[in-house]
């Protein structure tokens, strides 16, 4: 035979895929956030990895937009991004919220050590103020109790507590 074919078998380990950092933070006023996913080395193959989204923030366009999905990093590239979009800058005083993205089920790669990224959406709204509904009231001595109404200046997603003192010339009993 005048032709001989020699096949080189690729025995290199596939690259690892993971997040550039395991956490990041941004204010509600940031409209979107790109989270970087890295390969440990260049690959001659397209890489795909599934991701799931959990956390305390509400997805589906309420606090942000990002659903479970698949990221593709094209052959020759070493990074990709997953974008948390439409972060809602509401006017509600609330606790900071998290969006947790977890990588799994890669194709042509292995999952690296930093497979979970937590993005914290920090609330940028002031706590509401609290006031009495009226500045004074009165009642007969025979009244055994009196309910006083207080108002919040705005709705709050958190429980609101307030300390108060009682003073004056009347004596408690």
Where are these regions (language model features)?
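Short boundary segments that mark the start of a structured unit
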Residues: 1-173
């Amino acid at each position: 035979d005048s032709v001989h074919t020699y096949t080189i078998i690729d025995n290199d380990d596939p690259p690892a895929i993971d997040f550039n950092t395991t956490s990041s933070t941004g204010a509600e006023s940031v409209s979107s956030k790109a989270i970087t996913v890295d390969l440990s080395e260049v690959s001659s193959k397209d890489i795909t990895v599934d991701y799931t989204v959990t956390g305390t923030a509400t997805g589906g366009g309420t606090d942000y937009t990002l659903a479970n999905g698949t990221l593709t990093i094209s052959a020759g590239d070493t990074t990709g991004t997953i974008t948390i979009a439409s972060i809602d800058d509401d006017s509600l005083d609330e606790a900071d919220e998290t969006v947790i993205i977890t990588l799994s089920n890669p194709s042509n790669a292995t999952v690296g050590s930093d497979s979970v990224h937590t993005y914290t959406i920090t609330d940028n709204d002031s706590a509401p103020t609290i006031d009495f509904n009226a500045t004074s009231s009165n009642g007969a001595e025979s009244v055994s109790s009196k309910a006083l109404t207080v108002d919040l200046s705005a709705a709050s997603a958190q429980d609101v507590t307030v300390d108060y003192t009682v003073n004056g010339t009347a004596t408690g009993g």
